């Protein structure tokens, strides 16, 4: 099984993440940020990834450090779980609609961190959650998972729907990228021979 556990402790946050890439979509989430729990549940369910996240952070200030550090720690756990990437598809993509909203996410397990985040949320907050933190979560993930990630919200008039389509599409793109390629026979999916 491809799984990992990472603990990350700083003066601002204490994060513990367990990930199983060959899971059934089970999530146990206690981030202290309810909207982030809801979004991570989408990643687990649609990515068929078992995901456990517990976090304590300086939420008396705001959720920035907690959300960003969860992204960082998830990226670290993902890197450990995915291993050498031999025999994997490497690339994943997904379009996900939710009513009027539509988002596209494309990922490359390239070994090179890079992100394009093209999302104009229709409002600045979803309940108490600052939508700016969504890009911070993904940036933390990208920089520590060493992946290239393109996120595009193509339509939407409801910020919750915009966010949910992004996280669902991210889960589905991850699932595709980490699947075994039956024709690859365990080879590294790169002409360089390494990722």
UniProtKB/Swiss-Prot annotation:
It holds the Pfam family IGPD. Keywords: Amino-acid biosynthesis, Cytoplasm, Histidine biosynthesis, Lyase. PROSITE patterns: IGP_DEHYDRATASE_1, IGP_DEHYDRATASE_2. One of its GO terms (cellular component) is cytoplasm. Pathway: Amino-acid biosynthesis; L-histidine biosynthesis; L-histidine from 5-phospho-alpha-D-ribose 1-diphosphate: step 6/9. It is an enzyme of class 4 (lyase). GO terms for molecular function: imidazoleglycerol-phosphate dehydratase activity. Its EC number is 4.2.1.19. It is found in: Cytoplasm. It catalyses: D-erythro-1-(imidazol-4-yl)glycerol 3-phosphate = 3-(imidazol-4-yl)-2-oxopropyl phosphate + H2O. Its main location: cytoplasm. Gene3D superfamilies: Imidazole glycerol phosphate dehydratase, domain 1 (3.30.230.40). It comes from the Bacteria. Belongs to the imidazoleglycerol-phosphate dehydratase family. This is Imidazoleglycerol-phosphate dehydratase. The gene is hisB.
């Amino acid at each position: 099984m491809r799984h990992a556990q990472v603990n990350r402790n700083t003066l601002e946050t204490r994060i513990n993440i367990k990930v199983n890439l060959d899971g059934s979509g089970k999530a146990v989430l206690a981030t202290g940020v309810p909207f982030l729990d809801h979004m991570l549940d989408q990643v687990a369910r649609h990515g068929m990834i078992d995901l456990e996240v517990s976090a304590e952070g300086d939420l008396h200030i705001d959720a920035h450090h907690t959300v960003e550090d969860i992204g960082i720690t998830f990226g670290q756990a993902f890197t450990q779980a995915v291993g050498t990437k031999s025999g994997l598809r490497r690339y994943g993509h997904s379009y996900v609609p939710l009513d009027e909203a539509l988002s596209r996410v494309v990922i490359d397990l390239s070994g090179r961190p890079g992100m394009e985040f093209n999302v104009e949320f229709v409002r600045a907050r979803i309940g108490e959650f600052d939508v700016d933190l969504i890009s911070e979560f993904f940036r933390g993930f990208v920089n520590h998972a060493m992946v290239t990630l393109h996120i595009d919200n193509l339509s939407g008039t409801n910020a919750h729907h915009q966010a949910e389509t992004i996280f669902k599409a991210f889960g589905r793109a991850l699932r595709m990228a980490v699947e075994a390629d039956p024709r690859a026979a365990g080879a590294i999916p790169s002409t360089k021979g390494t990722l």
